[in-house]
From Swiss-Prot:
Protein name as annotated: Calcium-transporting ATPase CtpE
Pfam families membership: E1-E2_ATPase, Hydrolase
Enzyme Commission identifier(s): 7.2.2.10
Protein family membership: Belongs to the cation transport ATPase (P-type) (TC 3.A.3) family.
Its job: P-type ATPase involved in specific uptake of calcium.
Membrane topology of this protein: Multi-pass membrane protein
Compartments where located: Cell membrane
GTP-binding in keyword set: no
Amino acid sequence: MTRSASATAGLTDAEVAQRVAEGKSNDIPERVTRTVGQIVRANVFTRINAILGVLLLIVLATGSLINGMFGLLIIANSVIGMVQEIRAKQTLDKLAIIGQAKPLVRRQSGTRTRSTNEVVLDDIIELGPGDQVVVDGEVVEEENLEIDESLLTGEADPIAKDAGDTVMSGSFVVSGAGAYRATKVGSEAYAAKLAAEASKFTLVKSELRNGINRILQFITYLLVPAGLLTIYTQLFTTHVGWRESVLRMVGALVPMVPEGLVLMTSIAFAVGVVRLGQRQCLVQELPAIEGLARVDVVCADKTGTLTESGMRVCEVEELDGAGRQESVADVLAALAAADARPNASMQAIAEAFHSPPGWVVAANAPFKSATKWSGVSFRDHGNWVIGAPDVLLDPASVAARQAERIGAQGLRVLLLAAGSVAVDHAQAPGQVTPVALVVLEQKVRPDARETLDYFAVQNVSVKVISGDNAVSVGAVADRLGLHGEAMDARALPTGREELADTLDSYTSFGRVRPDQKRAIVHALQSHGHTVAMTGDGVNDVLALKDADIGVAMGSGSPASRAVAQIVLLNNRFATLPHVVGEGRRVIGNIERVANLFLTKTVYSVLLALLVGIECLIAIPLRRDPLLFPFQPIHVTIAAWFTIGIPAFILSLAPNNERAYPGFVRRVMTSAVPFGLVIGVATFVTYLAAYQGRYASWQEQEQASTAALITLLMTALWVLAVIARPYQWWRLALVLPSGLAYVVIFSLPLAREKFLLDASNLATTSIALAVGVVGAATIEAMWWIRSRMLGVKPRVWR
């Protein structure tokens, strides 16, 4: 075993106590995430809940509990949001790159396992195969020590460590043994710095969520004047009892609020989470489903994302010196079987040649980083070595030049050769005779090519980035259909604009540092791209966090899984197209649902304003002010089959239409004109049917019923338009919705319960006629809007 001059028996108890007192222990400071109280407050005290809460109190003041059922939406909206964010908090709080590793710490009082927070500066920590490096340090003892730093650097190959070399927290031992002295502990360690940066709380960007918030803000501004006007006119200008006035006022205010829009959006996201969960895809933030459907650039980390761990033998080229009785396949199988601690290359050979001939081993020389070869002497089959061609061959030989040519393609090349002396001889391997070149390549995930082809069809560009060498990265990219020269990231410009321009010219990048991965994401975003980052290592954490959507592999580091919005638990890259599909379903369906809810808001506000203005005009003219046409029960049944049930079904329906930006603009350009038509048509019918202050209860009920008929006809036509292009299930949604109202108006018990009276043939005829005109106007508007947006109007799919 090689020892450095700094190797010691470890610290004394007094030295340990002194370092703890000086704060030089591995106590990592608690990460800052939102508290449960902050999450609760953020989800309870929202704009939509404030609106609903005030209206609920008004309804309860009338004593009509049945009309206050919409208050349950306050609970539903809050609970769904809190559950999702608390789950995200719990995931972040569990972020621990070094996991539950128990390092073997050597001190003068003895060598034993300790928890990671007991480690102090200058502690000596022993390492063996599979052990994790828990703090940064310097190697003081080594015996063929090889460290896997792929989760930190992206470098696929294990790194041989000699005395004096540095090791970083988050890496682990592949083979050999050794010890290192802790040089950086606590928040100074490399992994701890990344963890602190990664654990800051963020929410994924969501055009749907932001758009709905903007719409709700706009609605709030409309509600204030419309609400105040309605309250004044219904309470102080009409000449009916206070309870009737309050009910009419509530009937005006309640439908102004798109009370189910936020809930339907949350349900649509939640159903997507469940569906993707069945595909072993964990969605840690609901809007991430939407986000991936909007992505136009995917930055894919090569190691662990596009490739699997390990190598595979892709070719064996026999050389001129192969005239021996032993077959190359038998020799390779025998070498693999004789290796007690195979590295990645020998494991690949063992997988390819898994039928060893059963030769008797006379001597064995394990692989050493210093010699770059391993070998076995067999009793009756000679001496065989396998290792680096540049070490075993004369650089001027034909075999060496052939190996160099193959290696330039990003492939790993090993030389199989026969030695002239036993492998345990002091002069081993002696004179070697080249027998074969064993060519290995990284294992590419079998589903990677199909997934990248899918993104290409969807016009989503893919950038392959890795800490591995550029030639190797380019070779993998080429096998996946991403052709073009790979660039060494050490030559990348540092300026954001220059970097963004360079990214447009190249597809593959090697030797990319963690901070460069982050810079690549920022540069792409600065040019207006929506960026997804896939990765599995600690070196991917910062880029995963800053990307619009972070996607981690389930087998990756705890840090990468914690900061990613989407985790592929089964490590299947091919799951991503299904996530895109779910995102499209949510985006397309919520746009339809938003049209329904906002159309209701527009016609409700307009109707309240028209009634209120009429009341204000009537006062100086000494005319009877209008009562609002509807009581809460009327607006409740109106919402059942024009919005509520259809919206729920539409929000969950299949939909693979491509997502485009401009959610708010598209919704407003349909909801506002449709709502105006419904509001005006309903008001015209009500004016024609209204009999004034001295009308009987039956006449007032008939006028309200007439207005409701017009509203239902036009609102149902909006549903019919929004449901296009038609499929059988959409027709099965629209037609029964209309039939449901026919049934309600036909049943005496329903008419009595819901305060409906369509017995006045004159007012009912007016309502039907105005309803037909309103529906025709909505149809014409739909065709005109489609032309204006440059969308081909489709009635049938």
